Amino acid sequence: MKIADNTEHVCVSVKVWLCICSIGILLMVLVGGITRLTHSGLSITEWNPVIGIFPPVSEKEWIAEKMKYMSTPEFKCLNFNITFQEFKKLYLIEYFHRLLGRIVGLIFLLPFLYFTYKKKLNKNLIVNFIIICVLILFQGVMGWLMVKSGLIDRPHVSHYRLTAHLLLALLIFYLLWRQFLSAVILNVTCNLKINNTLIFYVISILIVIQITFGSLVAGLNAGLLHKTVPFLEGRFMLEDLLFMKPLWSNIFDNPITVQFIHEVIAVLILVIVSATLLILRLNFFPSYLLLVCLLIQLTFGILTFIYNVPIALASLHQVTAFILFAINTYLLHCVKLLKLQHVKFVS
């Protein structure tokens, strides 16, 4: 997918729309995290894209929904003592998550159709937005496939499908945010002591990998492990990191290994970002914003782990990862523009 270069003629309303859509994705990530952390995701056992807009109203409808839930592994194994009011609470959280997904989808689709009809979008933009539209539709399908994995024989969703669901949200967010940056920031006047984009590509890749392992940590409940993993009683527990067979399966299926990799990548990103700012002396506010956001993200992560994954901290930890990715994407965009403008880099 090629981001439109000819953005001088993008009207203000399109720019505002792209910004709103990007914020909408962040809100979806936040609400999705809350839905997972409150264990609400499996309370709605059917996928009804149209009639699912309407929640149960009468007592009879609520009883019917709970009867469906009572046939799920989650109810049979974990929530067999759940009260009717507790079920309603879980149901409404998941309902709001799905409703918000529909709203965000319409916020993207309806203005897109309007702007296309009014010929406010060039051909390249139209193609880009069609791709995003398809990805949004697929995200809805992916969300249901994730939920479905927890309705068969296990009281929890597949951590692979959970990760795919989050990464697809990241891809959609990236495409919207990148298109917004291309429409709004047409030139850069600052001086940066850097003449290539490699370092920011490396940081972007590491953030994506970190988000991937963060999702695996969530899906495997690795954040609830003992607080000194993988260092117990002053010794390195290699046997805990590599006990699964085949060995490579530890990378994705062993909670201790997944949590350890998540921690190592966090330190690696901190070292690279700090070194980039110190060595290159990037006198550019967004570069310092990147470091500040990273430190906040690390703080959220550490506190989330220490305090047994509280909902507020864990939700903020997840959405801050997307914000960190957005800031780095902004820096990458600025460096690319500087190269295109043939700006002479100075110390």
Curated annotation (Swiss-Prot):
Cofactor field: heme b
Primary location group: membrane
Catalytic activity: Fe(II)-heme o + 2 A + H2O = Fe(II)-heme a + 2 AH2
GO BP field: heme A biosynthetic process
First-tier enzyme category under EC: oxidoreductase
Membrane topology, as annotated: Multi-pass membrane protein
Annotated compartments: Cell membrane
Residues that bind heme: 262, 317
Keywords, alphabetical: Cell membrane, Heme biosynthesis, Iron, Membrane, Metal-binding, Oxidoreductase, Transmembrane, Transmembrane helix
A molecular function GO annotation: oxidoreductase activity, acting on NAD(P)H, heme protein as acceptor
This protein's pathway: Porphyrin-containing compound metabolism; heme A biosynthesis; heme A from heme O: step 1/1
InterPro entries assigned: COX15/CtaA_fam, HemeA_Synthase_type2
EC number: 1.17.99.9
Membrane spanning stretches: 14-34, 95-115, 125-145, 166-186, 198-218, 260-280, 289-309, 311-331
A GO term from the CC aspect: plasma membrane
Source superkingdom: Bacteria
Family: Belongs to the COX15/CtaA family. Type 2 subfamily.
Purpose of the protein: Catalyzes the conversion of heme O to heme A by two successive hydroxylations of the methyl group at C8. The first hydroxylation forms heme I, the second hydroxylation results in an unstable dihydroxymethyl group, which spontaneously dehydrates, resulting in the formyl group of heme A.
Subunit structure: Interacts with CtaB.
Name the UniProt record assigns to this protein: Heme A synthase
Upper lineage: Bacteria, Pseudomonadati, Pseudomonadota, Alphaproteobacteria, Rickettsiales
Gene: ctaA
